[in-house]
């Protein structure tokens, strides 16, 4: 039995790749280059069944916010993406509806963005204390000299069908 265990340990030790290819850990350069973008956002929000609320006259709302993005350059076509966003909706109806988002995702070819994360808001139209939600987003960012112009589509599902959809644009610097 001892010989079998020793033989297995020897095979395991010899099979460990000591000089492995480092492509999975950042390629030839292991430097992590982070880029930061930030900017204003404005656009349209649709909150399903929001007109059932006493606070809102319509489910269609204007959105205004500020967003920060950090990308880790992947030395190729794929970058890692972190997004933080604060948005206020309902100003067109004299209502203040703030929300915050934190997402993680990918940026493809420095333009197409796909992300998922958490959404927090201070208002729950179902009155069941559902203040945290999943948020998914897809967007396109176009270079504009020293600025860039993003266009994002956001979906926030809800267990009680009070989902939200948003389309935003803005400017990054």
What annotation goes with each model-predicted range?
Residues 43-47, 85-89, 119-121, 154-158:
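Outer-membrane beta-barrel pore domains and translocons
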Residues 38-44, 82-84, 104, 114-116, ...:
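Membrane-embedded beta-strand positions of outer-membrane beta-barrel proteins
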Residues 1-29:
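Cleavable N-terminal export/targeting peptides
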Residues 20-65, 170-172:
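Short glycine/proline- and aromatic-enriched beta-strand/turn motifs that initiate or cap beta-hairpins
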Residues 75-80, 110-114, 143-152:
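Repeated loop/turn-to-beta-strand initiation elements of outer-membrane beta-barrel proteins
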Residues 160-173:
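Outer-membrane beta-barrel "beta-signal"
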Residues 65-67, 101, 135-137, 166-168:
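Membrane-embedded beta-strand positions in outer-membrane beta-barrel channels/transporters
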Residues 69-75, 105-109, 139-143, 156, ...:
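Structural signature of outer-membrane beta-barrel channels/translocons
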């Amino acid at each position: 039995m001892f010989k079998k265990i020793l033989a297995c340990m020897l095979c395991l030790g010899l099979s460990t790749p000591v000089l492995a290819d480092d492509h999975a850990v950042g390629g030839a350069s292991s430097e992590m280059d982070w880029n930061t973008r930030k900017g204003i956002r404005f656009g349209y929000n649709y909150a399903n069944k929001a007109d059932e609320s006493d606070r809102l006259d319509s489910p269609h709302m204007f959105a205004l916010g500020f967003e920060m993005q950090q990308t880790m350059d992947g030395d190729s076509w794929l970058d890692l993406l972190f997004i933080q966003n604060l948005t206020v909706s309902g100003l067109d109806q004299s209502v203040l509806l703030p929300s915050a988002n934190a997402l993680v995702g990918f940026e493809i070819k420095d333009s197409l963005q796909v992300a998922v994360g958490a959404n927090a808001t201070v208002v729950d139209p179902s009155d069941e204390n559902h203040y945290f939600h999943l948020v998914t987003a897809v967007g396109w960012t176009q270079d504009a000299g020293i600025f860039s112009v993003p266009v994002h589509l956001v979906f926030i599902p809800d267990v009680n069908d009070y989902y939200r959809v948003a389309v935003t644009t803005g400017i990054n610097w």
